[in-house]
UniProtKB/Swiss-Prot annotation:
Keywords: ATP-binding, Chaperone, Cytoplasm, Isomerase, Nucleotide-binding
Catalytic activity, EC: 5.6.1.7
Protein name: Chaperonin GroEL
Subunit structure as annotated in this protein's UniProt entry: Forms a cylinder of 14 subunits composed of two heptameric rings stacked back-to-back. Interacts with the co-chaperonin GroES.
Naturally occurring in which organism (per UniProt): Syntrophomonas wolfei subsp. wolfei (strain DSM 2245B / Goettingen)
Biological classification of the source: Bacteria, Bacillati, Bacillota, Clostridia, Eubacteriales
Job of this protein: Together with its co-chaperonin GroES, plays an essential role in assisting protein folding. The GroEL-GroES system forms a nano-cage that allows encapsulation of the non-native substrate proteins and provides a physical environment optimized to promote and accelerate protein folding.
Top-tier EC class: isomerase
CDD domains recorded: GroEL
Length: 546
């Protein structure tokens, strides 16, 4: 069993602070338009070059167990902010470092951390309310492009994301994929798509593109395995009489059933394409139901009391066109009623709010977007693998930041909103250690702007004082060296990003300040023996595998 060591009081807090500083100092050099990059070593493959706070934070683990605890705490700030808002991780880390540094000074001087915490909470509430007041809704295409361009530090990416959002709507799915070419492009897939293609290549209608295109088809949706043609014969005969093609979605189509469909297709008697149902288990049932609602059909499921032999034409779904590729099916313009689709979307949104699982949230988001129509794919290209990874990462970040901006609006960027929020903090009436907690947050609000200026090679404190004296919204443009209106200059941040950064930083800082003991594991005696020079002698023959 591993032994534990405990550190108390000031010694414990200082060890945590050293860990916080190590991580924050590595992350904060990336802040602002003139921020630097950080190179991350990889055991396999090429190193990663990035200026993304959360990517750097995730990669840092410290040797000293006490310092590592502080490092992990502030890493949590970056990860939580990234999960909620998709950006602002460097700002959050920097704010946490500033609050912890200032707070520990006061605790060492005799302030009561529990009362200070109350002051911190009050100040954060005032800042959050001020951010809401200052935020402006994002409505125009240009604002969306601006937010994305700032996050990715590339106007071309900004335009690409704005195009994607314009085409698939704000709830639409936008995915980022690696491309084989050097350039970055946008491809929009209209309608609902799922990652299952034709079961047999004999079903294709366009040999050049290797795809099957069905115009105005019927859609039979089933959750069972179909191996006998007798099961589906009654409904097939009804469809043949209409002269229309058909898409058959089932768990599996095999044996006699598949052979019969292929022979009829080759003879030109009947055009039917079979595809496997998407997803698995409960998610498959939900997705089949989504397809049914989108196409105004019903799922032929014995669980729902619908037997295959009893399926009539009015139970089949319809769409204007269906394109079936090797591993993808796209349903364009399904015949489902708008009201039914809206109700289904509302139901998925409710599930989204309730779920705790990140994976479930991602899958529900995908389903929601597929229902609301349209999937945009940004194909990222670059000359080298290292550049490709870095570029893809920037686009994913920009996409998350843009979605956050659409949700809660935008505020002035460049650390200006936090400086402007200081006035709101000053209005709070308090005294004693509570006031100390409030002042600690007030001082931390200056830190992002100071760091942006420092990274640009300018004296940060001078810039902070000038911006404090200027009107609301006026800040320092680190790229041009000019003091101007941030929003007019296109320097903007999503309000959600700024809000999350402040809340998460304050939460972790309050925890560090109120820590009185830190417990860490020490290597056990057996482990220590094993680590001796002779302990691993018998494994010398494996040297070649390293």
């Amino acid at each position: 069993m591993l032994s534990k060591e405990i550190k108390f009081g000031e010694e414990a807090r200082r060890a945590l602070e050293r860990g916080v500083d190590t991580l924050a100092n590595a992350v904060k050099v990336t802040l602002g338009p003139k921020g630097r990059n950080v190179v991350l070593d990889r055991k396999f493959g090429s190193p990663t070059i990035t200026n993304d706070g959360v990517t750097i934070a995730r990669d840092i683990d410290l040797k000293d167990p006490w310092e590592n605890l502080g490092c992990q705490l502030v890493k949590e700030v970056a990860i939580k902010t990234n999960d909620v808002a998709g950006d602002g991780t460097t700002t959050a880390t920097l704010l946490a470092q500033a609050m912890i540094k200032e707070g520990l000074k006061n605790v060492a001087a005799g302030a009561n951390p529990m009362i200070m915490r109350r002051g911190i909470d009050q100040a954060v509430k005032a800042v959050v309310d001020e951010i809401k007041t200052l935020s402006k809704p994002v409505e125009s295409r240009d604002s969306i492009a601006q937010v994305a361009a700032i996050s990715a530090d590339d106007p071309e990416i900004g335009q690409l994301i704005a195009d994607a959002m314009e085409k698939v709507g704000r709830d639409g799915v936008i995915t980022v994929e690696e491309s084989q070419s050097v350039g970055t492009s946008l491809e929009v897939v209209e309608g609902m798509n799922f990652d299952r293609g034709y079961i047999s290549p004999y079903m294709i209608t366009n040999t050049e593109k290797m795809e099957a295109v069905l115009e105005d088809p019927y859609i039979l949706i089933s959750d069972k395995k179909i191996s006998s043609i007798g099961e589906v014969l009654p409904v097939l005969e009804k469809v043949v009489q209409t002269g229309k093609p058909m898409l058959l979605i089932a768990e599996e189509v095999e044996g006699e059933a598949l052979a019969t469909l292929v022979v009829n297709k080759l003879r030109g008697t009947f055009n039917c394409v079979a595809v496997k149902a998407p997803a698995f288990g409960e998610r498959r049932k939900a997705m089949l139901e989504d397809i049914a609602i989108l196409t105004n059909g019903q799922v032929a499921s014995e669980e729902l009391g619908v037997k295959m032999e009893n399926v009539s034409l009015d139970m089949l779904g319809k769409a204007r066109q269906i394109v079936i590729k090797k591993d993808e099916t796209i349903i364009v313009d399904g015949a489902g009623s708008e009201q039914a689709i809206r109700d289904r979307s509302a139901n998925i949104k409710r599930q989204l709010e309730e779920t705790e699982s990140e994976y479930d949230r991602e899958k529900l988001q995908e389903r929601l977007a597929k229902l609301s129509g349209g999937v945009a794919v940004i194909q990222v290209g670059a000359a080298t693998e290292t550049e490709l990874k870095e570029r893809k990462h920037r686009i994913e970040d920009a996409l998350a930041a843009t979605k956050a901006a659409v949700e809660e609006g935008i505020v002035s960027g460049g650390g200006v909103t936090l400086i402007n929020a200081i006035k709101a903090i000053e209005k709070i009436e308090a005294q004693g250690d509570e006031l100390t907690g409030i002042n600690l947050v007030k001082k931390a609000m200056e830190e992002p702007l100071r760091q942006i200026a420092n990274n640009a090679g300018i004296e940060g404190s001078v810039v902070v004082e000038k911006v404090k004296e200027a009107e609301t919204g006026i800040g320092y443009n680190a790229l041009t060296g000019v003091y101007e209106s941030m929003i007019a200059a296109g320097i903007i941040d999503p309000a959600k990003v700024t809000r999350s950064a402040v809340q998460n930083a304050a939460s972790i800082s309050a925890m560090v300040l109120t820590t009185e003991a830190v417990v860490s594991e020490l290597p056990g005696e057996d482990e220590m023996k094993g680590m001796g020079a002779g302990g691993m002698g018998g494994m010398g023959g494996m040297g070649g595998m390293m």
